[in-house]
């Protein structure tokens, strides 16, 4: 098989197999071809991975942050040297076009290793607090063994976004990728060992729904970081609460993108397309509710339709391809069912709406789809679809659109396009979301915090803020004189 790894798991610095685990088939979404066959972790594999992490972590934590950071920066360099190889693997794993993966996937992971490697010492600083004759100081200390649970839309990026801050803070990690995309994280683990990471600090185990609870409920696990759906997040939070584990979650969204009548229409359309069709719409922060001022609606839809229908759908390994398949047959069927709901509930189909006829019948393709005249109560406007389906809604005034944008259980992201920056700042101040863009969309450099509010999760990925979620504050009071006691 064209992408078969040496074994299913990577534990304590080497590949490990246990064929007693449930078979996981890795399928290339463009053709339906099985490209690798792996096995889910058995309870014994889970124990082996956590034991390796627990054993390796204390010595790693005793190293200076600068020394830890140096290893991560080496890993970043190796990832960049192998960007083509890693990008092709990511395309096989996910079906995303190579023109995307080569600029956005391993590259983003390398950025994460480089950023956290570079700020290792400064980012973990404590504080000095004078108290008259006495004083106190604080320091950030690692949590111990951390578990990362990844999603299937950006497998290599997520493996790095969780691994980099965890490692630089002095922790060890056991990472479980999605069973839909099991391959990329294994390569990240290999590269970390090559860069000099001591064995046992970054372990990758495959798994299904049975594996997650084994990791989350393990008494030696101190923290769980999940990227996934809201229903999965609720289950993980409930399980972790039993042992009061640290938890961060980056979950789903149904984010608003607001286009005012003074916006640059072409730029706003570009933002809306990036926020709906990039990675075939499989991005948690997508602005899938596009609110367009009624005054410019007709022109907006005219230009949007032309640009959407001009997108090239095809072989993900062809560098000209702009739209690849969905990650799986099940995801394609889910998206197609939402498209049918949109039609049935009275939305106007502007573009797309089905399976393209220019691609392999075995691939999991869906046309980039635009609905107009969408109302707030329609299913496609309220539920996360996680596919290339854009909903365009009309609005008339600022107060109205803010209220409607906030009328959702989600709070991951949002965006505003307008030439009036005063209005832009006023609006984003009132939007209930964790990550917002003005005259841009879906840009997430590692230097800035990324995360949501409401049902879209808590905690932040990236930036200095991420280190707070992989460490805890220790306070030390120092008495400088004799103790005065009343007895």
From Swiss-Prot:
Protein's pathway: Amine and polyamine biosynthesis; betaine biosynthesis via choline pathway; betaine from betaine aldehyde: step 1/1
Source species, domain of life: Bacteria
Modified residues (Cysteine sulfenic acid (-SOH)): 284
Keywords from the UniProt entry: Metal-binding, NAD, NADP, Oxidation, Oxidoreductase, Potassium
Binding site for K(+) 2: 244, 454, 457
Cofactor binding remark: Binds 2 potassium ions per subunit.
Annotated positions binding K(+) 1: 26-27, 93
Species per Swiss-Prot/TrEMBL record: Rhizobium rhizogenes (strain K84 / ATCC BAA-868)
Entry-linked SUPFAM superfamilies: ALDH-like
Protein name, UniProt field: Betaine aldehyde dehydrogenase
Pfam families in the cross-refs: Aldedh
Gene name, Swiss-Prot/TrEMBL: betB
Enzyme class at the top of the EC tree: oxidoreductase
GO molecular-function terms, A-Z: betaine-aldehyde dehydrogenase (NAD+) activity; metal ion binding
Function: Involved in the biosynthesis of the osmoprotectant glycine betaine. Catalyzes the irreversible oxidation of betaine aldehyde to the corresponding acid.
Presence of the UniProt keyword Oxidoreductase in the record: yes
Catalytic residues, chain numbering: 162, 250, 284, 461
UniProt binding sites for NAD(+): 150-152, 176-179, 229-232, 252, 284, 384
């Amino acid at each position: 098989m064209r992408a078969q790894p040496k074994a299913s798991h990577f534990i304590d610095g080497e590949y490990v197999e246990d064929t007693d685990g449930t078979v996981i088939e890795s399928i290339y979404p463009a053709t339906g071809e099985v490209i690798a066959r792996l096995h889910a972790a058995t309870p014994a594999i889970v124990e082996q991975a956590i034991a390796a992490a627990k054993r390796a972590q204390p010595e790693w934590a005793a190293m200076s942050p600068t020394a830890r950071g140096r290893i991560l920066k080496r890993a970043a360099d190796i990832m960049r040297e192998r960007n083509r190889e890693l990008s092709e693997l990511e395309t096989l794993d996910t079906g995303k076009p190579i023109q995307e993966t080569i600029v956005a996937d391993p590259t983003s992971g390398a950025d994460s290793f480089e950023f956290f490697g570079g700020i290792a010492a400064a980012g973990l600083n404590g504080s000095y607090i004078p108290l008259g004759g006495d004083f106190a100081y604080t320091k950030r200390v690692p949590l111990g063994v951390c578990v990362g649970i990844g999603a299937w839309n950006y497998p290599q990026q997520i493996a790095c976004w969780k691994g980099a801050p965890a490692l630089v803070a002095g922790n060890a990690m056991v990472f479980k990728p999605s069973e839909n995309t099991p391959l990329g994280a294994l390569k990240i683990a290999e590269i970390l060992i090559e860069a000099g990471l001591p064995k046992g600090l970054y372990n990758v185990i495959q798994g299904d729904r049975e594996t997650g609870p084994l990791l989350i409920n393990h008494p030696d696990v101190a923290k769980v970081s999940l990227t996934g759906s809201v229903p999965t997040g609720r289950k993980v939070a409930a399980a972790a609460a039993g042992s009061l584990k640290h938890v961060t979650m980056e979950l789903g969204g149904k984010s608003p993108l607001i286009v005012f009548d003074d916006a640059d229409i072409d730029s706003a359309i570009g933002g809306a397309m990036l926020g709906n069709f990039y990675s075939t719409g499989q991005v948690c922060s997508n602005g899938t509710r596009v609110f367009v001022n009624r005054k410019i609606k007709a022109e907006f839809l005219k230009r949007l339709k032309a640009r959407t229908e001009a997108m090239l759908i095809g072989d993900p390994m062809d560098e000209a391809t702009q739209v690849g398949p969905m990650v799986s047959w099940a995801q394609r069927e889910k998206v197609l069912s939402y498209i049918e709901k949109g039609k049935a509930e009275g939305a106007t189909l502007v573009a797309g709406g089905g399976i393209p006829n220019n691609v392999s019948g075995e691939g999991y393709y869906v046309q980039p789809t635009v609905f107009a005249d969408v109302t707030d109560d329609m299913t496609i406007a309220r539920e996360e679809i996680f596919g290339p389906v854009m909903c365009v809604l009309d609005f008339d005034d600022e107060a109205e659109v803010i209220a409607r944008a906030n009328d959702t259980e989600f709070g991951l992201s949002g965006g505003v396009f307008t030439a009036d920056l005063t209005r832009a700042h006023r609006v984003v101040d009132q939007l209930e979301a964790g990550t917002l863009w003005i005259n841009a969309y879906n840009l997430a450099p590692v230097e800035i915090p990324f995360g949501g509010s409401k049902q879209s999760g808590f905690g932040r990925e990236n930036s200095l803020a991420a280190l707070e979620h992989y460490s805890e504050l220790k306070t030390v009071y120092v008495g400088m004189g004799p103790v005065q006691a009343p007895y």
